């Protein structure tokens, strides 16, 4: 695994559902655009067919990220294989074997989100086979943060950042 240093913060705008949202994102020029895929509990969820259409309008300079919550592996693989997605972000209870199987199937990055409440949660996140880890307070999209004081305990650990 390679440590990558960046001089700028990476931006991902997430939860887009409409063509007009995509056109606005193209103007804003974030690094990544996240789509919540086939998760009916979210009002921001899109179907596989909808994301295929939306990505057609996305600027090629913006990488599409599929955000999945306990999705069937076949859905994630299909969207990555066909080139709809540049990477997958897993936000459910996907275990190590799920992540390992997905990584064996694709060379595209896999991000795993972890809810951080304790130092043990941090330790578990750092053991993940995912290409990158995302540290979160729990359910995404709330704007709430976790206790960032847990991070300094791991300063000697190789930090992985999302590739461009």
For each feature predicted by the language model, list its residue ranges.
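Conserved N-terminal beta1-alpha1 strand-loop-helix module at the mouth
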Residues: 1-164
């Amino acid at each position: 695994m390679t440590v990558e240093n960046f001089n700028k913060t990476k931006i991902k705008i997430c939860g887009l559902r409409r063509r007009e949202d995509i056109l606005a994102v193209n103007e804003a020029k974030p690094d990544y655009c996240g789509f919540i895929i086939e998760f009916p509990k979210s009002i921001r969820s899109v179907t596989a067919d909808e994301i295929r259409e939306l990505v057609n309008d996305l600027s090629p300079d913006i990488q599409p990220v599929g955000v999945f919550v306990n999705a069937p592996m076949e859905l994630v693989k299909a969207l990555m294989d066909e080139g709809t997605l540049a990477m997958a972000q897993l936000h459910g209870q996907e275990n190590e074997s799920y992540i390992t199987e997905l990584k064996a199937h694709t060379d595209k990055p896999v991000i795993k989100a972890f809810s951080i409440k304790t130092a043990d949660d941090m330790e578990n996140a750092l053991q993940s086979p995912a290409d990158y880890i995302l540290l979160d307070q729990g359910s995404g999209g709330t704007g709430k943060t976790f206790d960032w004081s847990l991070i300094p305990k791991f300063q000697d650990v190789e930090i992985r950042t999302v590739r461009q």
